[in-house]
Amino acid sequence: MNELELKYGCNPNQKPARVFMKDGGDLPFTVLNGKPGYINLLDAFNSFPLVRELKEATGLPAAASFKHGSPAGAALGLPLDEVDKQIYFVEPDEALSPIACAYIRARGADRLCSYGDWAALSDECDAATAEYLKGEVSDGIIAPSFSEEALAILKTKKGGKYNIVQMDPAYIPAPQEQKDVFGVTFEQGRNNCKIDESLLANIVTENKNLPDDAKRDMIVSLITLKYTQSNSVCYAKDGQTIGVGAGQQSRIHCTRLAGSKADNWYLRRHPKVLALPFVDGIRRPDRDNAIDVYISDECDDVLADGAWQRVFKERPEPLTVQERKDWVARQSGVTVGSDAFFPFGDNVERARKSGVTYIAEPGGSIRDDNVIETANKYGITMAFTGQRLFHH
């Protein structure tokens, strides 16, 4: 099949719509279930190369959770500890495969933004991954293959309409790519830059310490940024993203947005949050929303009389501003990546408030000296990669 007709494009008025191969060849994917839309497939074909490159760079299974052209989260298939399982809604004794761990981590990076996501897997989707996805609100999934059991589970989602796309793992896109904007065709070479440890050799700070886990997290961050709408900044820890700031016109706003998401990821691990007395039978999205409000400045919206009764068995004690600040201050060992240079040291100032110890950015600002000086002030290790990663 060399063409797939779609219901409409980005919006219902944009008809007709289709995806096709310009050379007349067969499409490199098969729709196993559902009827994926235009935006679904944009997410699918941005997310699959991301997870494939993560797997190639690290040797570990990888997954991503995509929404509207950018990753809400991406992760490697590292085991979950007991706290991970609790905050990601996994049963303590549940057996999980590496690819299931990868997706659970990717979705757990920013569960609120992953609501209605497109899932991407580097490896075969197995029953454990499908079973977890079954309990989440998701629009579809792309993977190189699916086990029979996983396929049967996923086909029960959304009344049998869940979108399942199988990608040819051997497919390599053409070296040139095109897109039309306002009737004008743009053409460029594909961004085939390889992200690996060789990009991290130019450490420009006084602190040269860069352990293997930090190198891994830098690679996770940079590959994620390669497929994130610019401007973008990504915080990573323990083989997963914990905050992605996408599509901001200001670099500092990227750093703040991603930093606030990283703070929220860490606040989900606070003892008060882990002990929240949710009512029996509460749905995962309702828990996510309640936690998001509880750890915010708008906590009264979920703790007020008439509100808390809908989600909690009893009214929990507030998580105060000082408690939140003290908890986030404990965070450390975080890596941050940027798709372009930091123009000012204020980005470093903001990043270190979220526990950032390692930074990877291209360098090249006329104020690089100021950025390096700020990193040195906090003992941060910073590598200049020399590689910009804009994505539009």
Which residues does each predicted region cover?
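Active-site loops and adjacent core secondary-structure elements that bind or stabilize anionic groups
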Residues: 1-199, 214-232
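Gly-rich Lys/Arg/Thr-decorated short loops/hinges at beta-loop-alpha junctions or inter-strand turns
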Residues: 23-35, 109-115, 189-208, 285-307, ...
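Conserved helix-loop functional segments at active or binding sites
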Residues: 53, 227, 264-268, 353, ...
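Flexible, glycine/charged-enriched surface loops at secondary-structure junctions
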Residues: 57-65, 165-167, 230-237, 267-278, ...
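Glycine-rich phosphate/pyrophosphate-binding loops
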Residues: 61-62, 67-72, 76-78, 232, ...
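Active-site-proximal loop/turn and secondary-structure-junction residues that shape catalytic pockets
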Residues: 70, 125, 237-240, 248, ...
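Glycine- and Gly-Pro-enriched alpha-helical subdomains that act as flexible
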Residues: 72-111, 242-342
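C-terminal binding/interaction regions
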Residues: 117, 121-122, 135-165, 170-172, ...
